[in-house]
Design a protein with these regions (language model features):
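Secondary-structure capping and boundary motifs in well-ordered enzyme cores
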Residues: 64, 91, 135, 140, ...
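Active-site acidic catalytic loop and adjacent metal/ATP-binding pocket
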Residues: 32, 75, 124-174, 179-186
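Regulatory N- and C-terminal appendages and interdomain linkers associated
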Residues: 10, 206, 238-280
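Active-site catalytic-loop/activation-segment of kinase and kinase-like phosphoryl-transfer enzymes
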Residues: 87-127, 190, 194
Length: 280
């Protein structure tokens, strides 16, 4: 398959670097057959056109997700500091700021009160602190069913050029609490427990207490949910791409559920309730 990136907008080098890291870890990422970096042209092996998202159902989800978890563990086991940009406080904060800037101010056309701003600021500080306290590994950053291909070996992994070195729970929450498909909480817990058990056996630095690992997983997911709400609004209003706002209720549901389970996040739960009453 040919990849032709506009020279003025795209740098192919991160893609090539992360592809090499994935393949070295034993993950099925596209292999580069030929390249012309000056013209931003790549010739890649084809992983097919069947995404996880296009075929996922109740009957096959466990099999597909078990394969995805195995590939994720291989990727994380290959982690080395200095290979990828850090998922640091500045990046986490920029992502969280997308929520008030694009979802609240632009989509809802609301101005937060000083009390609401403080509640959001305090919550973001908690989320960032917990994220940075997690062990750091390679993070795909969009390890979700739309970017996993049904292939042999399974899965094929794409859209990895924004990979970073950061919180160990991030890719798992991207996989199991997706933008475009939702699962029962019991099933998400089962997948998280399967990952945690296998990761522990293989020597990854997950918390030895599953309840603490799951708390990290949930709080990391909340940071991602706020980010995605902002991104989807930005895609709609700035980039003029329709369809994304239709999936924002799923992320509000994720965020509300997590915020409602933890006493420290109660101010965010109240803020979400207030925002939902003002939906356009």
């Amino acid at each position: 398959i040919a990849m032709d990136a506009p020279p003025e907008r795209e740098d192919c080098r991160p893609f090539l670097h992360v592809a090499a890291l994935l393949r070295a870890a034993g993950v099925n990422a596209p292999q580069v057959i030929a390249q012309d970096l000056a013209r931003r042209f790549l010739l890649l092996t084809d992983l097919g056109d069947t995404t996880y998202l296009s075929v996922l159902n109740e009957a096959n989800a466990d099999r597909l997700f078990h394969d995805a978890i195995e590939a994720l563990i291989k990727w994380q086991l290959a982690s080395r500091e200095g290979e990828l940009p850090p998922y640091d406080e500045a990046l986490l904060r920029r992502e969280c700021n997308l929520f008030p800037e694009w979802y609240v101010a632009r989509h809802l056309a609301l101005r937060l009160s000083s009390a609401q701003q403080q509640a959001l600021s305090d919550t973001v500080a908690l989320l960032i602190s917990r994220s940075l306290a997690q062990p750091a590994v390679f993070v795909h950053r969009d390890y979700m069913p739309r970017n996993l291909m049904v292939s042999e070996p399974n899965p094929g992994v794409i859209d990895f050029q924004d990979a970073v070195h950061g919180p160990i729970s991030y890719d798992l929450v991207s996989l199991t609490r997706d933008a475009f498909v939702s699962w029962e909480e019991a099933r998400v817990i089962d997948w998280a427990a399967r990952y945690w058990d296998k990761a522990k056996q293989r020597g990854l630095p997950v918390d030895p207490d599953f309840s603490e690992f799951y708390r990290n997983f949930e709080w990391m997911g909340l940071q991602r949910h706020l980010k995605v709400l902002g991104i989807f609004a930005r895609i709609h209003y700035r980039d003029g791409k329709g369809g994304y706002l239709e999936d924002t209720p799923r992320f509000l549901n994720y965020a509300r559920a997590v915020a409602g389970r933890y006493r420290e996040l109660a101010p965010l739960a109240r803020l979400i309730e207030q925002l939902e009453q003002r939906q356009p």
